């Protein structure tokens, strides 16, 4: 059984985070990201921006969510993300960055001071 979906949904509920009609930025394309996207879609998100250092991995995750050439997922190139991040309500770190003590996510979070960062 996939516990990632249950765990992510519970973390949203426990922290009283409503994602309905929100714009979400997901950093990374690791295994957990697919579960997160599934839950976000079932909860009615407006748009998901997905960025990964390897763009093709993000595109592969986006593909199942394309319908009539439209998708709630927009892939953002990592370099563009660092220069001009999209305006979002919530940021989710799906990368391995942050697991080690000295890890730094190279994103300017000042733009997101009042946003939810997970």
Label each PLM-derived region with a short phrase:
Residues 1-22:
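Glycine/small-residue-rich loop that forms an oxyanion/phosphate-binding "nest" at active or ligand-binding sites
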Residues 10, 14, 38-42, 63-67:
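Short, well-ordered alpha-helices that flank and scaffold nucleotide-derived cofactor binding pockets
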Residues 12, 21-41:
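Glycine-rich adenosine-cofactor-binding loop
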Residues 20-22, 45, 114-115:
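Phosphate-coordination loops involved in phosphoryl transfer and adenosine-cofactor binding
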Residues 43-68:
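NAD(P)-binding Rossmann-fold cofactor-contacting core
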Residues 71-118:
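Rossmann-like adenosine-cofactor binding region
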């Amino acid at each position: 059984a996939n516990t990632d979906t249950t765990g992510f949904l519970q973390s949203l509920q426990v922290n009283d985070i409503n994602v309905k009609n929100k714009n979400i930025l997901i950093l990374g394309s690791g295994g957990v990201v697919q579960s997160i996207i599934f839950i976000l879609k079932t909860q009615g998100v407006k748009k998901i921006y997905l960025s990964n250092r390897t763009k093709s991995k993000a595109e592969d995750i986006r593909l199942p969510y394309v319908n009539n050439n439209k998708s709630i997922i927009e892939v953002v190139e990592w370099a563009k993300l660092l220069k001009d991040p999209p305006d979002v309500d919530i940021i989710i770190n799906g990368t391995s960055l942050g697991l080690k003590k000295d890890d730094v996510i190279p994103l300017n979070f000042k733009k997101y001071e009042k946003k939810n960062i997970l």
